Swiss-Prot record:
Catalyzes the transfer of sulfate to position 3 of terminal glucuronic acid of both protein- and lipid-linked oligosaccharides. Participates in biosynthesis of HNK-1 carbohydrate structure, a sulfated glucuronyl-lactosaminyl residue carried by many neural recognition molecules, which is involved in cell interactions during ontogenetic development and in synaptic plasticity in the adult. InterPro entries: Carb_sulfotrans_8-10, P-loop_NTPase, Sulfotransferase. Belongs to the sulfotransferase 2 family. Glycans are attached at residues 101, 318. It comes from Gallus gallus. This is Carbohydrate sulfotransferase 10. PANTHER family: CARBOHYDRATE SULFOTRANSFERASE, CARBOHYDRATE SULFOTRANSFERASE 10.
């Protein structure tokens, strides 16, 4: 009898240790940065499937470069799971009542003007400047049949919306708009919100490669008059002035004065209404090398056109550059800027820039 009790106790101990080990393994493979309270060990399954597919090239991204903050390695960035996760995050943030004022907007003419239509292949593309939109416009121009290849399209035509053959969604009747929004493949591209603002500032107020004089001669002086603290400073628009303008809760009156030129720095929410329009895919500038082929395939056009070659390193998030531009700007002004763009950070999974805010 004594031996039977010892055997029973030993069996119980083995079972108990097995249960503890199983629980530990499950916890180990849970995603530590998951957005919801309930976590599932999904990553292990996904990794196994991708390895079986033998993706030819693996790129390793640090956490800083992961747009959604999840623990995906480079060889998973083109995987459908990533894009499902982005859309799930978007839906969850859209439902957050605390962020409603930062995540929702009416589907106005301003929004419909941003969306370009390719009826031939049933595609809608929402323009978000400073994230490589010129190349996507070229893709759609070719698909619409205006040119046979991207290389043939003159740069002047791409931005001439009267001649490039890309109608805006706003040009259709209400019933036609509704039909296209319900049935067409819809996408847009985002990037780190603060890095996008730096790009807009450089492109419009520093280099101005398209020779658009109104940015320097009309918009810049208006911002300087209202937001420059040192009235003795005679330089052109500085990034600090730009940040104060964008972070001012009363910026709307200047936005109205500037008209459609504000598309280069207003929020993604204001441009594309992502909580009101159900988009099929949201690409990220930081992972565009993987996202562009995925979008083409998801839209069913990957055999008809290719996304132009991306120069090495051009889409990589540059923390050093961001720190350099924001150095010398008060924490108060940076926090006010973040308060305006918080919806963009949360909706698309970009990390809070604590290195600037604190």
């Amino acid at each position: 009898m004594h031996h039977q009790w010892l055997l029973l106790a030993a069996c119980f101990w083995v079972i108990f240790m097995f249960m503890v080990a199983s629980k530990f393994i499950t916890l180990t493979f849970k995603d530590p940065d998951g957005y919801g309270a309930k976590q599932e060990p999904l990553i292990l399954t996904a990794v196994t499937k991708v390895e079986e597919a033998r993706v030819p090239e693996e790129k390793h991204w640090t956490k800083e470069f992961q747009p959604t903050g999840k623990a995906f390695t480079g060889n998973l960035l083109h995987h459908p799971l990533v894009h499902m996760e982005r859309l799930e995050l978007l839906r969850n943030v859209c439902r957050d009542t605390a962020l409603r004022n930062l995540s929702h907007t009416a589907v106005s003419k301003f929004v419909l003007d941003r969306i370009f239509v390719c009826d031939k292949h049933k595609i809608l593309f929402c323009q978000t400047p400073k994230v490589g939109n010129t190349q996507w416009k070229k893709v759609l121009i070719v698909l619409n049949g205006a040119y046979s290849s991207i290389d043939e399209i003159p740069e002047s035509i791409v931005h001439d919306h009267e001649k490039n053959g890309l109608p805006r969604l706003s040009s259709f009747s209400d019933s036609e708009i509704k039909k296209r929004l319900n049935l067409y493949f819809k996408f847009f591209i985002v990037r780190d919100p603060f890095e996008r603002l730096i790009s807009a500032f450089k492109d419009k107020f520093v280099h101005n490669p398209r020779f658009e004089p109104w940015y320097r001669h009309e918009i810049a002086p208006s911002i300087i008059r209202k937001y420059r603290r040192n009235r003795m400073e005679t330089k052109g628009l500085q990034f600090e002035d730009f940040v104060r303008y964008l972070g001012d809760p009363n910026h709307r009156w200047l936005d109205v004065q500037f008209g459609d030129h504000i598309i280069h720095w207003v929020t993604y929410v204001e441009l594309c209404a992502p909580c009101e329009i159900t988009y099929s895919v949201i690409g990220h500038h930081e992972t565009l090398e993987d996202d562009a082929p995925y979008i083409l395939k998801a839209a069913g056009i990957d055999r008809l056109v290719s996304y132009p070659t991306i120069p090495p390193g051009i889409t990589v998030y540059n923390k050093t550059k961001v720190e350099r531009y924001f150095s010398g700007i008060s924490k108060r002004d940076i926090r006010r800027l973040y308060a305006r763009f918080e919806g963009d950070f949360k909706l698309f999974g970009y990390r809070v820039p604590d290195f600037l805010l604190n």
